[in-house]
Design a protein with these regions (language model features):
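S-adenosylmethionine
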Residues: 1-446
Length: 446
């Protein structure tokens, strides 16, 4: 691997894409690991990240155009040739600052450095055709589902689902946002600072800061570089969390001195939000299956100056008798398909619908078990980062049908919207991640 130039960034990007395709690795984890090995400059690391996420966000569209100029089917090419072609085509079609000739020549070089010199002529010819025709590319397929699927690189099953839930026009708006860069959203830590002071501090460190348009204490950042190098992060004056997830505070109605159970707590954002709202007074029990994730929660709490959080390694489906009826608020942020956060994790879109088929059963089991921990008069909060009804309102509706000791209870959002016990947030409507949130009250007498 060559050092100190943008070609090195391309080699690094190729390694990430190959790891994702060959090993099923998640892009964010694979990218972080690869950047740790490559020792790239900040500029090259940014280019590497842009290529990785850009190729993933546009894979079906890139395949469509490449297939028009390649004499062989892309999936018949020896690995990693298809990814080399996508890397080159992405730069030609989407990165104005990269000259076409550089995108072509460096892609040819990737062939040579990855044992595919014999295919360098094919890669050169295909990418030159893409560059020559980029103002006159092949038309997209006809029909709304096929067109939207290729144009925004989402599988047709998901496009059809979105159209059934929204409309063709609004589904397209959702898909468009999925392919945009996701803002880095952080929450102010009121135990250590306030919004104005944090904004001033971050701007003083050269960070571009925009307060969220309607979620108090939520800031959107850009130009941060590595967040962990910021003094404000090191000193615990903010935590990373999307605006939608922070709205758990609205549904949970936390108060000082409460006992709160966070059933599926990792990576800890909702437990931290609870601690902020409770002014660090009370008890929060944060649970997860894996001790390594609990360790990160404890480290985060220490950084933020939170002392009311304890952790426990627990399966959310396994009943703990000693917790029965003991908690004022129980939070169930259950494992889900993640289809509301595709702009953060673009590789989620390429999952098959069948990959998610077992989730509602798991979600129901966690909700059923967690409800047993809510004291009479207490709150049960259920949330996901997906937009699929079968993981959202269908789960909570079915739960309430089977448990008349619980009922939906209305709550309000900071933008004035009143939710009749549950709601779905949409990125194209609400400037948040896609997110489902519900609030259920246990009756004082069962």
């Amino acid at each position: 691997m060559r050092k100190g130039n943008t070609a090195n960034a391309r080699e690094c990007a190729l390694s990430v894409l190959v790891a994702c395709r060959r090993n099923g690795a998640w892009a964010d984890a694979a990218l972080k690991a690869q950047l740790g090995k490559c020792a790239l400059s900040a500029q090259d690391a940014a280019l590497c990240s842009r290529i990785v996420y850009g190729v993933m966000q546009n894979e079906l569209l890139l395949n469509w155009y490449l297939s028009a100029y390649c004499t062989q089917k892309l999936d018949h090419l020896q690995p990693p040739l298809s990814d080399i072609l996508r890397i080159g085509a992405y730069q030609i079609l989407f990165l104005d600052k990269v000259p076409d000739h550089a995108a072509v020549s460096e892609s040819v070089e990737l062939c040579r450095t990855n044992g595919r010199s014999a295919a360098s002529g094919l890669v050169n010819a295909v990418l030159r055709k893409v560059a020559q025709n980029k103002s006159n590319l092949p038309p997209l397929p006809e029909g709304n589902f096929a067109r939207l699927s290729v144009a925004y690189s989402h599988p047709q099953w998901l496009v059809k689902k979105l159209v059934s839930l929204l409309s063709v026009e609004e589904a397209e708006a959702f898909l468009r946002i999925d392919n945009e860069a996701s803002p880095i959203s952080v929450q102010v830590n009121p135990l250590k600072t306030n919004e104005k002071a944090l904004v001033d501090e971050l701007r003083g460190e050269g960070v571009c800061v925009t307060p969220h348009p309607w979620v108090p204490g939520c800031l959107e950042l850009s130009g941060t570089g590595d967040l962990t190098t910021l003094s404000a992060f090191y000193n615990g004056r903010f935590t990373v969390q999307d605006a939608a997830a922070h709205l758990i505070v609205c549904a949970a109605d936390f108060a000082r001195g409460q006992r709160v159970l966070d059933v599926c707590a990792a990576p800890g954002g909702k437990s931290f939000a609870a601690a902020f709202a409770m002014e660090n007074e009370g008890r929060i029990l944060s649970c997860d299956l894996h001790e390594n994730k609990l360790k990160r929660i404890r480290e985060g709490a220490q950084r933020l100056g939170i002392t009311c959080i304890e952790t426990a390694a627990v399966d959310g489906r396994a009943f703990r008798e000693e917790w029965a009826g003991r908690f004022d608020v129980v939070i169930c942020d259950v494992p889900c398909s993640g289809l509301g956060i595709i702009r953060k994790k673009p590789d989620i879109r390429y999952k098959d619908a069948q990959d998610f088929s077992a989730l509602p059963e798991i979600q129901r089991a966690i909700l059923e078990n967690s409800a047993r921990y809510v004291k009479r008069g207490g709150l049960l909060v259920y949330s996901t980062c997906t937009i699929l009804p079968e993981e959202n309102e269908q789960v909570t509706d079915d739960f309430l049908k089977a448990h008349d000791e619980f009922t939906y209870e209305a709550f309000s959002l900071p933008n004035g919207v009143s939710a009749p016990g549950h709601l779905t947030l949409w990125p194209q409507r609400d400037n948040t991640d896609g997110f489902y949130l519900s609030r259920m009250r246990r009756k004082t007498h069962d």
